[in-house]
Amino acid sequence: MCIRDRYRVSALQTARLLADRALSGVSRGHLRLAPTWTPEEASVVIQIRLPRILSAALIGAALSAAGASYQAMFRNPMVSPDLLGASTGACFGAALAILLGASYAVITAGSFLFGLAAVGLTYLVGRLSRMRSNLAMVLAGVMVGSLFSAGTSFIKLVADTNEQLPAITYWLMGSFTSASYQKILIGLSLIHI
C-alpha cells in the first residue's frame, strides 16, 4: 500500500468536516447564539458570518492549489508562492498602489501584476544562473522576495502615518470583514479560470 493512499480524503468528507466546523463555530465567540435564532441573529449568521466562512474556505483552497501547482511545476515539494517571491511582489504592488492613492481595483490589479512580475524576475534570474536547477530557482526567489520585501518596508517608511500606513498594514494583514456573496462568486469565477 502506498503511503499516499493511506491519507486520501474525499471532497465530500472535506466538505462535511468544513460544514461541521462552520456550524459548530456559530455559537462560539464573543456573542453566543442559542440553537434557535431571532431574525437579527439569523441575519448576522447568514449575511455576515457565512460569507466570511465561505471566503476563508475558498481562499484556503486557492492557496492550496497554488502551492500544489508550484510544487508540480518546479518538481520540488519545498517550493511555494512565497518562496518564489510572488507573495512579497504582490505586497509591494499593493503598498505602492496605496501610496499613490489608487482605487481598490487598481490596488488589486497592482498586487496581482507585481506578483506575476516577481515570479517572472525569479524565473529570469534562475535561468541566467550557472546552476540551472530547481535550487537556483529557489535561491533566486529568496533574492527577489528580499528585494520586494525591502521595497515594501521603504514604502511603509515614507507613507503618511495617518492614512496610508494603516491602509498598507491592514491590506498586508488581510481581512474577511468585507466578504459578501457577490465577492465569493467573483472569486469563484477567477479561481476557476
Model-identified regions with their sequence ranges:
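Alpha-helical transmembrane segments in inner-membrane proteins
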Residues: 4-191
